[in-house]
């Protein structure tokens, strides 16, 4: 297996292809877009609050806007941390819980659906820890719901299996779970030099 750390010279986006996707897939993709707004672009988050239905209807202007913003957010993070030494960990917002749910559900949930549930779980935990206000936690949850994404762990998920799966996450250190947290809307919590995960 060979991996390269070369960045693309150009990114091409075919918005017309989005129109061929079923609504569940569009919603699933929107989870990552909402995540990008939460972790690095308040303007994107606020745009989605006003226009999420247009995106689901594949409005050309709305889709072009979020496609461009998605690329910009990810580019900023990846170019500052090409080799995944710290900052890039912020792209895992919602993924600690989300990946575990996705696996334990035996992939009955799309990736974005599982990430949406994980984002709500991490926002609620972040609220308890004082990183995000109740108002902003509710904004995240409501936007995910408007994007037609689940926000609660389905009843069929075995809770014991889920907890066990959480401990296989790549961010676990010395047997301790670590989460990344958003700071209100549009920023990430930093817990020291190049430290974005918290036990």
PLM regions: where:
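A glycine/threonine-rich phosphate-anchoring loop and its flanking beta-alpha core
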Residues: 1-53
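Solvent-exposed alpha-helices and their adjacent loops that cap or buttress functional pockets
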Residues: 2-6, 82-83, 171-173
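Short beta-strand segments
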Residues: 5, 12-13, 92, 180-182
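A generic hydrophobic-helix recognition signal that picks specific residues
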Residues: 7, 87-88, 177
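Structural motif
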Residues: 9-11, 114, 178
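Residue-level signal for inorganic ion chemistry
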Residues: 14, 119, 185
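C-terminal charged capping/lid subdomain of soluble metabolic enzymes
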Residues: 31, 131-199
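Active-site segments that bind and position negatively charged phosphate/pyrophosphate groups
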Residues: 46-160
């Amino acid at each position: 297996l060979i991996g390269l750390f070369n960045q693309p010279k150009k990114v091409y986006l075919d918005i017309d292809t989005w129109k061929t996707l079923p609504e569940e897939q569009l919603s699933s993709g929107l989870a990552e877009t909402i995540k990008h707004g939460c972790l690095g672009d308040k303007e994107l988050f606020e745009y989605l609050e006003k226009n999420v239905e247009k995106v689901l209807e594949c409005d050309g202007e709305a889709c072009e806007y979020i496609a461009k913003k998605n690329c910009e957010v990810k580019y900023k993070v990846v170019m500052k941390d090409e080799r995944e030494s710290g900052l890039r960990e912020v792209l895992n917002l919602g993924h600690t819980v989300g990946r575990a749910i996705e696996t334990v559900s035996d992939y009955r949930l799309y990736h974005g659906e599982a990430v949406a549930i994980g984002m709500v779980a991490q926002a609620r935990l972040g609220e308890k820890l004082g990183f995000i206000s109740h108002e902003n936690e509710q904004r995240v949850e409501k936007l995910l719901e408007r994007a037609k994404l689940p926000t609660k762990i389905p009843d069929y998920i075995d809770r014991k299996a889920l907890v066990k799966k959480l401990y296989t996450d790549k961010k676990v250190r010395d047997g301790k779970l670590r989460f990344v947290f958003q700071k209100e809307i549009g920023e990430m919590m930093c817990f020291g030099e190049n430290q974005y995960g918290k036990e």
